[in-house]
């Protein structure tokens, strides 16, 4: 369930195209569309690089050593975000670059369906991570028996199954639309009964945004309250660490809310009100698009690169590659080194 941006907008009726923006066209697509494509490109490049690095670091676990539950959730989040960036953004960018849909019915269904699946997987994973941290800090005595890889993998499986099921109406109702007065083709949601779409939009907002956000806030509020009570018995180093955790938590909640709130506002507005078609609303929809897409790029920064341990492991990845490349070069120069194994003194997460 994604935002439509052509002369067809959210809803079940064909709306007239909004007034054209004042600036002239750039490369034949308009200044606003060109800027949007540039932003998409930056989000794509940053997100693919960041999520690929996260996956690489987390995949380098020591043999026989189980991954932590936190790392498993971060890995799942990065895989979902990377898949979304690779499979959705390049195709969705054609909406801004071309006046009509040219990618066929399957791609039309797939990218909008996977957009919703990825959105739900990300949100549910963030909620699962908040519960995981709550158990680890507030119920530390019982956490060792609950926070095990098997339970985390089971949670990941449930997250994907639930997301795939919740997004299925999008795959069913998304399709090609051919206006009678035009030879153009659009990729658009078509619901026979408007009441069903209203119900689905509300359910997606409640179960795919509001409740997970409330759960995240509840868990982190409990965590911060627990840490505040324990601060008196902590060393300065430990106190600084807990404050860092509190700052990260604040960033997590704020970014989560900001990234997806405009997306849901537009869908609710379109279904239960009259969404205006003006240059201002057009820019608002573009902003909502970019914010939703950027969430897949900022997650690696929030959950990985703010961690000192992760940064150290990230540096070790490059050190290991440098050592291995150096060893391969040495073996070519000296036959006496052919049987010498490469250095494996690398840190794993």
UniProtKB/Swiss-Prot annotation:
Listed SUPFAM superfamilies: Family A G protein-coupled receptor-like
Residues covalently joined to lipid (S-palmitoyl cysteine): 320
Transmembrane segments: 37-57, 71-91, 110-131, 152-172, 201-221, 249-269, 272-292
Primary localisation category: membrane
GO molecular function: G protein-coupled peptide receptor activity; galanin receptor activity; neuropeptide binding; peptide hormone binding
Function according to Swiss-Prot or TrEMBL: Receptor for the hormone galanin. The activity of this receptor is mediated by G proteins that inhibit adenylate cyclase activity.
Protein name: Galanin receptor type 1
Species the sequence originates in: Homo sapiens (Human)
Lineage, uppermost ranks: Eukaryota, Metazoa, Chordata, Craniata, Vertebrata
